[in-house]
Design a protein with these regions (language model features):
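Membrane-proximal interfacial segments on either side of biological membranes
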Residues: 1-217, 222, 229-317
Length: 317
């Protein structure tokens, strides 16, 4: 059943029923019928598969040594220890031990969906992931805590060992984000910091555009906008070694005044009098993941890039 690379190979039928290292039950049957394979079962833990997908690691797609179409119908798919999908179905086309095409869909509760597509043309692989329930994806980023609600769109184009990706998250709330809390505190925006540590700060949209090559992630732009604050930043991350980010944070009241609107949160954020409080702040975050250093400086004007991105989002909404 297994070849020298420990891949499942040359089989007509195999039954799998075991507890994995996460203590999740996996119960599957892989069966060949004519030139097609069928993967059915009651449960499967896809935690590692999701991790590989987000990091653009192909190792998870090379478990089965077949060149065929694979039809999937699994009752329950575990995304982690808390979240799971039901009625997970779809088709995967495999060639040279790599996924060439995939179209998969599953359901959360309350009619929420997860949809995954993969299309490989020549040497370019396009991956899209849409999730009505963003939390099981976002919680994988350990520095974000207290994330709630929201839907997520993920797009990635990979050629050779380089990938260009985009993540968008809509209508979500953050309750804990240590780095952001520190920036707000250093910037004397205690009103917003208190909201963040209490009921949480709501964002209408988050967009991150980035590239991956080896252990280096280059963040071309992160932009987030919400009723309380807007943030624009860029930088890079060396996996398990170094994080380097710089950006601008501006209270919503500043943006509203700039475009001639009434302040949304009023004096709690920037004070009672005109000119009181901070117009905005620039910040830098740098260091090893467990020892990040943060610096903050006030800014008197907004960059054209920040203004353009903000107006784009306001017009869109």
């Amino acid at each position: 059943v297994f070849n020298e690379k420990l891949q499942i190979s040359g089989l007509d039928e195999v039954d799998l029923d075991y507890l994995d290292q996460d203590r999740q039950k996996n119960s599957l049957t892989l069966k060949k019928s004519k030139k097609k394979y069928f993967l059915t079962g009651s449960s499967f833990n896809a935690d590692n598969f999701i991790e590989d997908l987000l990091s653009n690691d192909d190792k998870g797609s090379k478990i089965i040594d077949i060149n065929s179409n694979l039809e999937i119908d699994i009752e329950k798919i575990f995304l982690d220890s808390e979240y799971y999908l039901t009625d997970f179905k779809g088709d995967i086309s495999i060639k040279n031990n790599e996924i060439q095409k995939a179209n998969l869909i599953g359901s959360f509760s309350k009619n929420k969906k997860l949809k995954l597509t993969i299309n490989k043309d020549n040497n370019n692989k396009i991956t899209t992931l849409y999730v009505d329930e963003a939390k099981p994806i976002v919680k994988r980023y350990k520095f974000i805590k207290g994330f709630d609600e929201g839907s997520l769109d993920f797009y990635s184009s990979k050629k050779s060992k380089k990938s260009v990706s985009q993540i968008k998250i809509y209508d979500f709330k953050l309750k804990e984000l240590p780095i952001l809390t520190k920036i707000l505190t250093l910037a004397s925006l205690q009103g917003i910091a208190d909201i963040l540590s209490g009921e949480g700060i709501r964002f209408t949209e988050f967009e991150m555009n980035f590239k991956n090559e080896g252990d280096l992630m280059t963040i071309e732009e992160i932009y987030a906008i919400g009723p309380a604050i807007s943030i624009l930043m860029e930088g890079y991350v060396e996996k398990n070694k170094l994080i380097s980010l710089k950006g601008t944070l501006v209270p919503a009241t500043t943006i509203n005044n700039f475009i001639g609107s009434l302040p949304m949160l009023g004096e709690i954020l920037v004070g009672k009098k005109t000119g009181e409080g901070v117009f905005g702040v620039s910040f830098k975050i740098k260091g090893p993941p467990k020892n990040l250093k943060t610096s903050v400086n006030p800014v008197k004007t907004l960059t054209p890039r920040f203004i353009t991105r903000t107006l784009e989002k306001i017009k869109k909404n």
